[in-house]
Amino acid sequence: MDVTRIGRSNEMVNKMKALKISRKTAKFAVARLMSPVSTIGAAKFGPLSLVNESAPTMPNAEGWHRIQPRLTGICGSDLSLVEGHASTYFDDWVSFPFVPGHEVVADCDDGRRVVLEPVLGHACRGLPLPFEGAAPGDGDDYAHLVGGHLEPGIQTGFCHSTGGGWASELIAHESQLHSVPDAMSDEQAVLVE
């Protein structure tokens, strides 16, 4: 990660490389048309671009960590985005632009090697659980996926606020992070999702 001085101030900003999906209808259309002929062409001319930008901002809340991916998977949902075949059904549950990548094994800022549970549930968003004993993503209406102190997003990798594993850094809530045993390789851990 580069540290870059911006403007005339002494403010230092972390810059990172990331693959980002932008909401550009024409690029999605081109990717969809090209993907049956050339998946490389779909990726090259579609909505995915390599950017150098600031790392995600930490929410003003407890329990958040910066993580640096060691290995990130490429899921079918990621491929459908790159190839222009993603359903628009979930558009309200996503915040553009976003960095894909929700199958992640990473180094956490507290020294742990962790795997990411990608759901951006109640705990991540600073919202109360809907009932006692609820899991992080439980709920009956899923309105929490657009609430709290994060932008809309079903999970990490589809939310502008958190970033995703296709970048050199992202943020994750403690409720999403699970320590990886030493006996488990990164290649095994990335499949945990």
What are these model-predicted stretches?
Residues 160-167, 184-193:
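A glycine-rich, Thr/Ser-enriched phosphate-binding loop motif common to dinucleotide/cofactor-binding enzymes
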Residues 73-76, 157-159, 193:
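Glycine-centered small-residue hotspots that permit tight backbone geometry or close packing
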Residues 2-100, 168:
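Short N-terminal strand-loop motif that marks the start
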